[in-house]
């Protein structure tokens, strides 16, 4: 036993000597590397940018359930009891885009229903903030820091110059942990079809984005803003490397409108259309898979005056190729009325270009699922009743869709939602922004006034 112990001790000593020798050899390496160029790092860029990315804290009260009118309870029973408004707190991120004015860009869903908004900088300072304006369709909101001092603003890049494979860095306040930076690449551009409410024309990235990152910055390696982090695809509730950001050009345009008008003024192209598909390409004998197929041109619209025709395929907008109808809709909806845009078309297989002046009319149209998924399959527009009253006209209902199953029919006119009178799509959006558990639509159909109920 004694010999064994000595042997183990000797082995230990031997190993110790060997490790020490190895350590001495390794220890000399840093001295050799010190004279070489420094390792690549994002630290210098982030040191300049982090002061411009802020944490957004909101407080407010929200109803936990929609009060059900007595006359409707017989249809739904008492399984949705009335709930009093409950206080809530929320966390998100934001980006300072104007230091002297204290303007901060964030997501609409971060500040929705907030009654108090506060901003915390990365140096620990806190400020109260007020809402300048917001837009639920694009999920953009503009805040203003009260009594700002010694702020840092972020430079904004041209997101139209992005390419798939460009490096990207996401900065925000995930889970309330504090400022966090993650890196990745631009995975895709013009991403749509995510079944989100509103406009979809996203930058996709694999830079990790989590809850609390909403409203934060997506940056290029120069530290310039290329997007506002907005959503993630998260089957399990956490990041799986598929995040989405609103392009900086779109965010900048919307922010300027909110500064100038306090709201978003949308241009109207005056067409109805759908995504280009292999079936459409085959039917028209075309070798094109991307773009927007024009199914109808509204009479008297800017497109009609410019000569756009049903059956045309819109392949580009202002010289930039279009991937989808969703991208076209998103880009037009963030352009002011009266703006002239150039459309690249394919007609009978031949390319041509037309210039369209976006309508300045206050009329509006929208796919109903952009307002609430319960109305998916219906196309809406601001309309008029026979007596001159205003409402929301049902232009089209897709057979078998949720809207059709709920009982909506073409030419119905919605005049009320949950006892609130609505005269326009904009007013309907505001009523449904609270996401009521029960939706009761008051509809004029011919000479009758009826109610349709849906969850």
Curated annotation (Swiss-Prot):
Protein name: Periplasmic pH-dependent serine endoprotease DegQ
Record text on subunit structure and interactions: DegQ can reversibly switch between different oligomeric forms that represent inactive (6-mer) and active (12- and 24-mer) protease states. Substrate binding triggers the conversion of the resting DegQ trimer and hexamer into catalytically active 12- and 24-mers. The conversion of 6-mer (DegQ6) into 12-mer (DegQ12) or 24-mer (DegQ24) is crucial in regulating protease activity.
PROSITE patterns in the record: PDZ (PS50106)
Enzyme class: hydrolase
Notes on how activity is controlled: Inhibited by diisopropylfluorophosphate (DFP).
A GO term for molecular function: identical protein binding
Role, per record: DegQ could degrade transiently denatured and unfolded proteins which accumulate in the periplasm following stress conditions. DegQ is efficient with Val-Xaa and Ile-Xaa peptide bonds, suggesting a preference for a beta-branched side chain amino acids. Only unfolded proteins devoid of disulfide bonds appear capable to be cleaved, thereby preventing non-specific proteolysis of folded proteins. DegQ can substitute for the periplasmic protease DegP.
One BP term from GO: proteolysis
The family this protein is said to belong to: Belongs to the peptidase S1C family.
Biophysicochemical property: pH dependence: Optimum pH is 5.5. The degradation is efficient at pH values between 4.5 and 6.
SMART domains: PDZ
Database matches in SUPFAM superfamilies: PDZ domain-like, Trypsin-like serine proteases
Annotated PDZ domain residues: 258-349, 355-447
Keyword Repeat attached: yes
